[in-house]
UniProtKB/Swiss-Prot annotation:
Belongs to the conotoxin T superfamily. It comes from Conus pennaceus. Residues 23-48 form a propeptide. This is Conotoxin Pn-B0151. GO terms for cellular component: extracellular region. The cysteine framework is V (CC-CC). Contains 2 disulfide bonds that can be either 'C1-C3, C2-C4' or 'C1-C4, C2-C3', since these disulfide connectivities have been observed for conotoxins with cysteine framework V (for examples, see AC P0DQQ7 and AC P81755). Coiled coil: none annotated. It is found in: Secreted.
């Protein structure tokens, strides 16, 4: 009999939690593929700057 109130409280807590589908997306949510695309673009830009002028070192660090 003492376990019954605990069981009822647990059922109420489980029923009141929102499901994953109920959570709304915010503007800060970004797909992981987009993040990987940005990383690839940044790395390509950096590699292009490094190979722009291998004889003059000062322009490669810009």
């Amino acid at each position: 009999m003492r376990c019954l109130p605990v069981f009822v409280i647990l059922l109420l807590l489980i029923a009141s939690t929102p499901s994953v589908d109920a959570l709304q997306k915010t503007k800060d949510d970004m797909p992981l593929a987009s993040f990987h695309d940005n990383v690839k673009r940044i790395l390509q830009t950096l590699s292009n700057k490094r190979s722009c002028c291998p004889t003059i070192l000062s322009c490669c660090f810009v």
